[in-house]
Design a protein with these regions (language model features):
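Conserved, mostly hydrophobic/aromatic
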Residues: 23, 44, 135, 199, ...
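Glycine-enriched alpha-helix->loop->beta-strand junction motifs that scaffold or abut catalytic
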Residues: 50, 129-134, 236, 267-269
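Active-site-proximal loop/turn and secondary-structure-junction residues that shape catalytic pockets
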Residues: 26, 58-59, 111-113, 141-143, ...
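An N-terminally biased module of ancient metal coordination in phosphate/nucleic-acid-related enzymes
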Residues: 1-115, 119-123, 211-218, 267, ...
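Active-site-adjacent C-terminal substructures of enzyme catalytic domains
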Residues: 219-220, 224-276, 281-282
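Extended substrate/RNA-proximal surfaces in nucleic-acid metabolism proteins
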Residues: 75-230
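Short, composition-biased local secondary-structure segments
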Residues: 2-17, 198, 225-235, 260
């Protein structure tokens, strides 16, 4: 092993010994780089990826704005709008036709779990599930101190505005996050429920900023275990999201090494995801020196020992 931080990637890779990126965004992402998606596909081919899964942020329900209390820009740039969905699907289909002989391209959505809006999400999946694959369920919004919902990953300042005194109660805040995620995992989203759970512990994105401890308390450990057990029983899988490595106040894979170990013991598979929003993100994850395959190879050696 070459001592890279990607050594944290550990567990049962559903695409063992294959170069597959299961979490990538497109030129349509409102908080992305704007890089042309065709050029991202060409970069993926150059990096010898066998498969790339586009998982653009699914539109949020219009009514959600009434219970959202955070920064307006965070909401406005969070996801596609409903009138962009067909454009996104057409883009993906065009890319499949253009590059399909060189790389397997999957088209799906990253869907938000929003308590109180489950029927909207199920309706969306019922409509678009038949024409998509590799959909991901993620938690980007959570109820704050004053009620209402706030974006979890927009900025440290927004996080402080949302959770106030809870900032000094890390265990309480983490507990609320994992309780919410568990509800999402248990929710019946129908036959087209997302097969993967995105960046499972992204609550830690600002850990270093708030000087939080890296360890989970016993309550959070129990909640995570229940989440993983539920996913295993449902035949679902984890998004091993490498974007956390490049986040200024995180510096870790989502999920943590500890959670990776729990998932491995349970036999819960994962798929590596760059969460790329740009060509550079793909390069950083899969290019020379990233050693992602070396990390996976070492993980398998540990598991087979």
């Amino acid at each position: 092993m070459k001592g890279t931080r990607e050594a944290e990637v550990f567990g049962i890779n559903r695409y063992r010994n294959r170069r597959v990126d299961g979490h990538v965004h497109t030129e349509l992402c409102p908080h992305g780089s704007g890089d042309k998606t065709a050029l991202m596909v060409e970069k993926a081919i150059e990096l010898h990826l066998e498969k790339i899964c586009f998982t653009e942020h699914a539109p949020l329900p219009v009514e959600f704005s009434k219970v959202y209390l955070g920064d307006k820009k965070a909401l406005d740039t969070a996801a596609l709008t409903l009138d962009q969905v067909e454009t996104y699907l057409a883009l993906g289909n065009d890319l499949q036709k253009e590059y399909g002989e060189a790389i397997d391209i999957s088209l799906g959505f990253e869907v938000d779990y929003l308590p109180g809006f489950e029927s909207y999400t199920r309706s969306f999946l019922d409509q678009y599930g038949p024409v998509t694959g590799d959909n991901i369920l993620s938690l980007h919004f959570m109820e704050g101190m004053a009620g209402g919902y706030w974006c979890l990953d927009y900025s440290p300042q927004e996080f402080e505005n949302a959770f106030g005194p809870w900032i000094d109660q890390q265990d309480l805040l983490y507990g609320r996050y994992f309780e919410t995620l568990l509800k999402g995992v248990r929710t019946d989203f129908g036959p087209y429920r997302p097969k993967r759970i995105g960046h499972l512990d992204s609550i830690k994105k600002f850990n270093r900023y708030f000087h939080w401890k890296p360890e989970l308390d016993d309550k959070s450990k129990g909640l995570v275990l229940e989440i993983l057990r539920t996913l295993k029983s449902q035949g679902r899988e984890l998004d091993y999201n490498l974007s956390g490595l490049s986040k200024e106040y995180c510096g870790e894979v989502y999920p943590s090494r500890y959670i990776q170990g729990m998932a491995y013991v349970l036999g819960l598979p994962y798929v590596v995801g760059s969460d790329a929003h740009s060509i550079l993100d793909l390069q950083k994850t899969w290019g020379p020196g990233a050693a992602i395959l070396d990390a996976q190879a070492e993980a398998h050696e540990e598991g087979d020992a």
